[in-house]
């Protein structure tokens, strides 16, 4: 694991909302869908998705759309989600 990966993992682990929201991103999804699954408000979910995008954990595949934006985990995002899933199982 590279130093940058460790920093991103640590950043996600430190925040309960970040930890939980990354677990609900599966395939293509909208902020509304993720908010409904996670139980967090759309405002908080959108804010966290923006932070994830800046950190390179998710990618918005239609950024010019004002509504119905679709997000997908990047390789780094999947790596972090998988690490968190393994941690939960143990």
Task: Label the predicted regions.
Residues 17-24, 79:
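Pre-recognition alpha-helix immediately N-terminal to the DNA-recognition helix
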Residues 1-19:
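Short alpha-helical segments that sit at the start of domains
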Residues 1-3, 79-90:
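Amphipathic alpha-helical dimerization/coiled-coil segments
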Residues 65-84:
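Basic, amphipathic "hinge/linker" alpha-helix immediately C-terminal to the N-terminal HTH DNA-binding motif
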Residues 16, 26-33:
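Short capping segments at the starts of secondary-structure elements
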Residues 34, 49-55:
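Basic amphipathic alpha-helical segments that dock to polyanions
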Residues 43:
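Key DNA-contact positions within bacterial/archaeal DNA-binding proteins
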Residues 53-63:
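A short, conserved structural fragment
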